[in-house]
Amino acid sequence: MKRLIVSCKTADQVFEDFKRTAKKVQRGVRQEPQYEVSFDNKADFNRFVRNIPVLSAIMVFKPRSVYELAKLTHQDVSNLNKVIQFFEEIGVIRVKTARHAGRMVKQPHVEYNEVTFRLAA
């Protein structure tokens, strides 16, 4: 099961996590792969949180096109394309090009089964 961890960390904290993991690898300790998206500014994190319903709709309904997703979420296609592009840039979703009913369509796809938030107080 692939789990995505979403967190708010500074660049220094991410680097420390990387060093800790590199030391474990050098010692030969194998861990389960960890997929994490860390935000270093609150604006991007808030944008992610605001658009969780879109991510959830992609995971649950597995739409065959952006247009179908727009109908499911009751959002404008142009606004939805911006959200999808944001998610794709941070690596949360992949957009595949597929042929549906004779037309080339963009199909958003989430590769994770679960999204977890890890927030420090």
Predicted segments with their positions:
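General nucleic-acid-binding
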Residues: 1-24
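Short acidic, hydrophobic short linear motifs in intrinsically disordered regions
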Residues: 63-71
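Short, cationic-aromatic polyanion-contact patches
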Residues: 42-49, 65, 98-121
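A short, conserved structural fragment
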Residues: 91-98
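Short amphipathic alpha-helical interface segments
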Residues: 50-62
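Basic amphipathic alpha-helical segments that dock to polyanions
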Residues: 69, 84-91
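Short alpha-helical segments that sit at the start of domains
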Residues: 27-53
